[in-house]
Amino acid sequence: MTDLPDSTRWQLWIVAFGFFMQSLDTTIVNTAIPSMAQSLGESPLHMHMVIVSYVLTVAVMLPASGWLADKVGVRNIFFTAIVLFTLGSLFCALSGTLNELLLARALQGVGGAMMVPVGRLTVMKIVPREQYMAAMTFVTLPGQVGPLLGPALGGLLVEYASWHWIFLINIPVGIIGAIATLMLMPNYTMQTRRFDLSGFLLLAVGMAVLTLALDGSKGTGLSPLAIAGLVAVGVVALVLYLLHARNNNRALFSLKLFRTRTFSLGLAGSFAGRIGSGMLPFMTPVFLQIGLGFSPFHAGLMMIPMVLGSMGMKRIVVQVVNRFGYRRVLVATTLGLSLVTLLFMTTALLGWYYVLPFVLFLQGMVNSTRFSSMNTLTLKDLPDNLASSGNSLLSMIMQLSMSIGVTIAGLLLGLFGSQHVSVDSGTTQTVFMYTWLSMAFIIALPAFIFARVPNDTHQNVAISRRKRSAQ
C-alpha cells in the first residue's frame, strides 16, 4: 500500500478509526455491568439489556446501511454514523436511570451498525481491486486491538474513575473522527436499486419484538398476556416477510439463498452457535466480580487471554479445517467449547484462580476456530450474484443471535437467583453454578446441526486459496 496517494492513506486511517471505536465499545461495557447496576440502583440481573439494546439495534439496522451509503454517499453516512455513536456515548454517560441508558445504547447501535459496513464499502471504492485485501487487513487491525484493550481499559476506568468514563472517552475520539471525515473523505455514491422497505420493516419488527418477548417478565416487567402478544406479532411479521420475499427479486434477502445447503446449515449453526457463545463475554466478567469478588480491573485483565487465544488461532484455522473437514471441526469445537465452559466454572469455584487465564486462553482458541469455520462454511458455496446478500444476512444473524444469547444469560440468572444477587449473598455461587451448567448445555446443542454438514474436505481448499490471496 506504499504506492497509494497520501489522501487515500488518510481515508484508510479514518475507516480504521471507526472500526476501533466500534470494536472497543463491544467489550469495554461488559466489565462495567456490576458498577452500573450499583450506580443506577438496579439488580445486576437486569443489566444484560444494556448489551442487548446495542447489539439488537445493530442487527436491525445492518441491512439498511449499505443501501444508505450508496444512495446518500459514504462520507455523509460515515460522518452521520460517528456523530450518532458519539452522541449516544454522551447520553449514556449522562443517563440517570436504566431506561435512559438503554435508549442511549440504542442510539449508539444505530451509529455502530452503519460504521463498519460503510467503512468496508469506502475501502472498496477508494482502493484499487488488487490492493483491496491489503487495505482491509490494515483497517481491520485496530478492530482486533479494540477487544483486547476493551475489558482491561473498562475495568481500569471503572475502578479508578467511574463507569461513565467508558462512554466519555468516545467523545473526543468521535469529534476528531467526524471532523476528519468531512475534511478528507470523498462522498462516493452509486446508482441503487429500490430499497425493500417493506421487507426491512417486517424483519425489524420480527427481530425486535421476539427478543423483547424472550426477555419477558424478568427483564421488562411485562404481563404474560403482553408477552404472548409480542410473540404473536413477531411470528406474524416473520411469516409475512417469507410471503413477501417469495418470488420477489427485490426482496431484502432472497429466499434463493436457502437453496444452497451449506448456507442453510451454516446459517442455522451460526445462529444457534452464537446464542451460546454470545453469553460468555457478558457472563464471564459479571461472574468474576459478583461471584468471585474480583475488582473491575482484575476482571478486565482476565479477559485478555481469551482475546489473545482467539487472535492466535486465526493463523492456523485454515490448515485445521483443510486437514479435518468442516463437520469434524465444527462438532469438535462446539462440544469442546461446552467442556471448556464447564472447566472454567469448576476451576473458578474451586479457587484455582491461577489456572483461569489458561482456561480462558483455550476458550478463545476454540471459539475462534468455530467462528471462522462457521463463517466460511456459510458463504463458500453461494453463487456470485447472491454472495453479497448472503454476507449481509449472516452479519445480521450474528448480531441477533448474540443479543438473544445475552438475553438468555440474564434470564438464567433470574431463574436460579433472587432479584438481589451480590457478592455478599451466600447463594450467589450456587446461582452462577446452575447458570454455567445451563450455558454449557446450550453451547453444546448446535453440534446436532453441524453433524449434518457434508464432510467434503476438498472444498476447504477454497479457504486456503482466499487466505493466500489476502497475504
Swiss-Prot record:
Task: Kindly provide the name given to this protein in its UniProt entry.
Answer: Putative multidrug resistance protein MdtD
Report the sequence similarity comment from the record.
Belongs to the major facilitator superfamily. TCR/Tet family.
HAMAP family referenced in this protein's UniProt entry, alphabetically? MFS_MdtD (MF_01577)
| Chain ranges on the Periplasmic side, renumbered to this chain | 1-12, 70-76, 125-137, 186-196, 246-262, 307-341, 417-430
Q: Give the residue spans that cross the bilayer.
A: 13-33, 49-69, 77-97, 102-124, 138-158, 165-185, 197-217, 225-245, 263-283, 286-306, 342-362, 396-416, 431-451
- Superkingdom of origin: Bacteria
Gene3D superfamilies named among the record's database cross-references: MFS general substrate transporter like domains, Multidrug resistance protein D
Which PROSITE patterns does this UniProt record tie to the protein? MFS
Organism listed in the record: Shigella flexneri serotype 5b (strain 8401)
| PANTHER family, alphabetized | BLR6921 PROTEIN, MAJOR FACILITATOR SUPERFAMILY MULTIDRUG TRANSPORTER MFSC
Keywords of the record, alphabetical order, are: Cell inner membrane, Cell membrane, Membrane, Transmembrane, Transmembrane helix, Transport
Q: Name one GO molecular function term.
A: transmembrane transporter activity
Residues on the membrane's Cytoplasmic side span 34-48, 98-101, 159-164, 218-224, 284-285, 363-395, 452-471
Membrane topology, as annotated, equals: Multi-pass membrane protein
SUPFAM superfamilies tied to this protein: MFS general substrate transporter
NCBIfam families recorded for this chain? efflux_EmrB, PRK10504.1
Q: Which GO terms describe its cellular component?
A: plasma membrane
User: Where does the record place it?
Assistant: Cell inner membrane
Q: Which gene encodes it?
A: mdtD
